[in-house]
């Protein structure tokens, strides 16, 4: 067994962007561990340390050499490897070549299965770790991927990296491992903070690496996170009731923007609090990575948190500089908002004629007109009052107007939000303003639904218009490709219709496509409508499975092609509960239903002749008629537990029927009459669920 030493591989660069750095951190540890394993170098824990200017792997207890190995590989069967004369066949020669041995050296022996095979055996001598580590590090640094970021060529070679590589520190114990990349060769030095610890710093061994960094003004990502969180906690403790808003994406980016974080608090002028807080906060978060501070009532305060890449003694100068920067940014936001208030939303809306929605689907103005008509149709379908329908129509009329406003052009994520402010400013009522503000919701999984009913209507209309249009031009989602986010839009509609607007979207899909036809878009309306219905149905099934509804329950309900979300999920819940309460009945009923479906002939219809029936047949006929009446009444009342209880009552008569009646009688008249009765039995289920899809427990 070889000795073991700690190993360090550090790539030093110019400041790397946060997102690719995080991605590289995930890659580096995996690549190093995999490379060591494949090379046969024993090792301990692999840790990755990063900062804006470095990416490093620290590996504990790396063997200084590989172990000597006696390698045995099994090849083809002996009768395939050698011909009748004992000569090696092509199969044996290929196997030997692959294993790096001569065909004559292959060994024949019986394996555990009793058959004779050929085996290649060879001794692989121990190899020193240093050359292996050199090759691994050079392969790793060249193999790091930078998705969504263009790698650039540095030095005189063809090597590329996301930022210029300035130094490489690579050590196995106290010994330098030679590594070269882009005209840079490895050594035993690292570099510290540009201001707090400039220049080269000797790393005597991997064990002292983190301490050397800290002494040079560089903390690891974990330490930086802890320091920032502690600083923010102190800020909040000094301001009882206040809360520092730290969105995850921005927070992670800030961690990767500094090497020695210091949490400071700055302020901006009171006048900026008159501007909608959403654009103030977005300006601070996205442009400067400042964290807003809210008071105990959730209102934005004049203070903000800035994370400085320096020590506290520089605080006054750093705060002053950041306050000057934030004032310039907020001046811009205030200017955009005040200029927008000089123009009505109706005037903004007319400008949408020059904004394309989609190349083949016309302008955003045309889209807003379709949304308005769809919103009114949804209000009618939901049987809402005239006042609420009018609010939904007005909100739909104006919902896209803010897209051409100054504030939204600058802060695109605030589309809808700014429209809500502008609607209030021009005298629209709260329902209209809130609907405009909320109509993009839900924007992602777990997002809130629109606050008001009008907002739910406009949100559904907007999303359904997009889905219908993209399907009409033949560009639906395929596999993992969904460039128009139609799956997300469909899930948004389903969540709204499930929780807030219990309506069936079938007729609305047809109407949405009709509006495109009136616009001159050519497509097969019936075919596309079916595609859209199938698309919604697929999302319903997927969501039910994600919610852990049993797969066979989902299959039973989805088999009757319901796309009204509230109905679909209510039926799934009722069937699942019925099965839990009386599993035996539904298992047996499922078996009987499947048997009936297997032999039935739908073309015979359901009109049977009672005069040809015996007692068991009459019992099933009476039970089917009674169950049909009960199911129909339950469906009208949306009492799905009652509907499934009515189906459960069919178990005894169908079991008796199959026990006592020969369905496929030689007498054609009797046979057909019994098949018609089974058709009638099946028809009872057709409007609620296909019980035959249920799993049978034996």
Regions found by a protein language model. Give the residues of each.
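Amphipathic alpha-helical "coupling" segments that flank catalytic cores
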Residues: 1-698
């Amino acid at each position: 067994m070889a000795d073991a030493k700690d190993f360090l591989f550090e790539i030093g660069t110019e400041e790397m962007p946060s997102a690719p750095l995080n991605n590289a951190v995930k890659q580096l540890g995996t690549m190093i561990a995999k490379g060591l394993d494949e090379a046969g170098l024993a090792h301990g824990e692999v840790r990755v340390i990063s900062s804006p200017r470095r990416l490093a792997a620290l590996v504990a207890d790396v063997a200084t050499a590989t172990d000597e190995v006696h390698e045995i590989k099994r090849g083809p069967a002996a009768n395939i490897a050698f011909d009748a004369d004992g000569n090696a066949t092509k199969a044996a020669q290929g196997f030997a070549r692959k294993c790096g041995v001569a065909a004559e050296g292959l060994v024949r022996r019986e394996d555990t299965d009793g058959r004779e095979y050929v085996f290649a055996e060879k001794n692989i001598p121990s190899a020193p770790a240093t050359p292996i580590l050199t090759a691994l590090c050079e392969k790793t640094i060249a193999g790091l991927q930078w998705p969504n970021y263009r790698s650039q060529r540095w030095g005189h070679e063809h090597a590329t990296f996301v930022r210029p590589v300035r130094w490489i520190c690579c050590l196995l114990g106290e010994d330098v491992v030679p590594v070269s990349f882009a005209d840079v060769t490895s050594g035993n030095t690292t570099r510290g903070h540009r201001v707090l610890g400039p220049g080269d710093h000797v790393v005597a061994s991997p064990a002292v690496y983190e301490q050397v960094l800290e002494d040079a003004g560089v903390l690891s990502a974990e330490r930086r996170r802890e320091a920032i969180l502690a600083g923010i906690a102190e800020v909040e403790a000094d301001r009882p009731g206040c809360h520092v808003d730290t969105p995850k994406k921005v927070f992670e980016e800030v961690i990767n923007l500094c090497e020695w974080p210091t949490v400071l608090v700055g302020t901006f002028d009171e006048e900026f609090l008159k501007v909608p807080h959403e654009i103030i906060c977005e300006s601070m978060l996205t442009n400067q990575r400042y964290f807003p501070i809210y008071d105990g009532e959730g209102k934005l305060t004049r203070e903000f948190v800035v994370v400085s890449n320096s020590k506290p003694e520089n605080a006054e100068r750093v705060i002053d500089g950041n306050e000057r920067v934030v004032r310039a940014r907020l001046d811009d936001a205030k200017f955009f908002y005040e200029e927008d208030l000089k123009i009505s939303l109706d005037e903004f809306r007319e400008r949408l004629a020059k904004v394309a929605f989609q190349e083949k689907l016309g302008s955003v103005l045309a889209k807003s007109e379709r949304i308005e008509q769809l919103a009114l149709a949804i209000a009618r379908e939901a049987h809402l009052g005239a006042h609420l329908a009018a609010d939904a129509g007005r909100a739909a009329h104006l919902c896209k107007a803010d897209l051409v406003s100054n504030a939204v052009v600058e802060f695109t994520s605030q589309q809808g939000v700014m429209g809500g402010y502008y609607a209030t400013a021009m005298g629209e009522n709260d329902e209209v303003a809130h609907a405009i503000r909320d109509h993009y919701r839900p924007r992602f999984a777990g997002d809130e639904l629109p606050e008001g009913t009008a907002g739910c209507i406009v949100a559904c209309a907007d999303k359904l218009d997009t889905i219908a249009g993209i399907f009409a031009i033949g560009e639906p989602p395929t596999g993992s490709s969904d460039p128009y986010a139609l799956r997300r839009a469909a899930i948004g509609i389903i969540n709204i219709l499930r929780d807030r607007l219990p309506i069936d979207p079938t007729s609305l899909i047809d109407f949405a496509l009709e509006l495109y036809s009136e616009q001159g878009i050519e497509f097969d309306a019936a075919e596309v409508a079916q595609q859209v219905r199938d698309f919604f149905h697929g999302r319903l099934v997927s969501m039910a499975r994600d919610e852990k509804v049993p797969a066979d329950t989902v299959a039973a309900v989805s088999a009757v092609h319901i796309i009204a979300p509230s109905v679909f999920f209510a039926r799934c819940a009722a069937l699942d509960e019925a099965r839990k309460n009386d599993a035996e009945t539904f298992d047996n009923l499922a078996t009987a239903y499947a048997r009936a479906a297997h032999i039935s002939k739908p073309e015979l219809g359901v009109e049977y002749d009672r005069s040809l029936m015996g007692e068991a047949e009459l019992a099933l006929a009476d039970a089917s008629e009674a169950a049909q009446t009960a199911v129909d009444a339950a469906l009208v009342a949306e009492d799905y537990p009652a509907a499934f209880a009515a189906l459960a009552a069919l178990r005894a008569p169908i079991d008796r029927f199959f026990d006592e009646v020969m369905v496929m009688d030689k007498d054609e008249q009797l046979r057909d009459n019994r098949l018609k009765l089974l058709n009638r039995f099946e028809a009872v289920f057709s409007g609620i669920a296909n019980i035959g899809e249920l799993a049978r427990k034996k």
